[in-house]
Amino acid sequence: MSKDIVLISGLTKTFSSASEKLVIFDKLNFSIEEGKKISITGESGSGKSTFLNILGGLESADSGEIIAGSYKVHSLDEKSLTEYRSSFLGLVFQFHYLLKDFTALENVMLPALIAGRSKKEIKEKALSLLEDVKLAERKNHFPSQLSGGERQRVAVARSLINSPSLILADEPTGNLDPANAETVQNLLFSVVDKHKKTLVLVTHDQNIASMTDISYKLYKGNLEEV
């Protein structure tokens, strides 16, 4: 029997300036089924990245409840938020955020080391994840020695090192040329399926969105299935 990994109730988010008040979400109700790959499209400024930031505990909503797994994200203190981000979530952004003085392998291992796991314990898993994204032979290369697509593939591998339940990906191929974008996107879907993770993908590319299990369009504060 399927179950929901994320439940959102009454989510409200606004931005205010001196001249106007912009409503991003107005009492949004939404759920995400465990094990599904979903995509969110929408116009620039519609709130796609804001949605991911709120779900990821990187930004606060004005009101509403967000339950992700056993975490009540809307009411977590900073210590619990850190635990939520490091253990429950895997994050992939448009920019790779790799440390330039760390090799590909070391960059993949880093989140687990920060979480207090031993280097010996995680090295084998990090190598396996690099194999998943077809970069095992470049494990000792530094970011400057990798192409843009390869750097983003390292970021995909890194997102899985702490065995998260939910992967949040914000335009992960947005800075890549079409050929590299296709490679990275296919590998992201492949590793998500292999490791049985749930994926929430923000993209402007309708072709990529059509490859997910369910695609939603964010329009006027509502997520509508397309």
From Swiss-Prot:
For this protein, the record's SMART domains field holds:
AAA
GO cellular component terms given for this protein: plasma membrane
Domain ABC transporter as annotated: residue spans: 6-226
List, in alphabetical order, the Gene Ontology terms for molecular function in this entry: ATP binding; ATP hydrolysis activity
The UniProt entry, under InterPro entries, shows:
AAA+_ATPase, ABC_transporter-like_ATP-bd, ABC_transporter-like_CS, MacB-like_ATP-bd, P-loop_NTPase
Instruction: Give the enzyme's main class according to its UniProt record, as a single word.
Output: translocase
What EC number is given for this enzyme? Answer: 7.6.2.-
Membrane topology summary: Peripheral membrane protein
- The residues forming a coiled coil are none
Sites binding ATP sit at: G42, E43, S44, G45, S46, G47, K48, S49
Task: Write out the annotated subcellular location.
Answer: Cell inner membrane
Q: Which family does it belong to?
A: Belongs to the ABC transporter superfamily. Lipoprotein translocase (TC 3.A.1.125) family.
Tell me how this protein assembles: The complex is composed of two ATP-binding proteins (LolD) and two transmembrane proteins (LolC and LolE).
Function of this protein? Part of the ABC transporter complex LolCDE involved in the translocation of mature outer membrane-directed lipoproteins, from the inner membrane to the periplasmic chaperone, LolA. Responsible for the formation of the LolA-lipoprotein complex in an ATP-dependent manner.
What is the name listed in the Swiss-Prot or TrEMBL entry for this protein? Lipoprotein-releasing system ATP-binding protein LolD
Query: From which organism does this entry originate?
Result: Treponema denticola (strain ATCC 35405 / DSM 14222 / CIP 103919 / JCM 8153 / KCTC 15104)
In the record, what lineage is assigned to the organism producing the protein?
Bacteria, Pseudomonadati, Spirochaetota, Spirochaetia, Spirochaetales
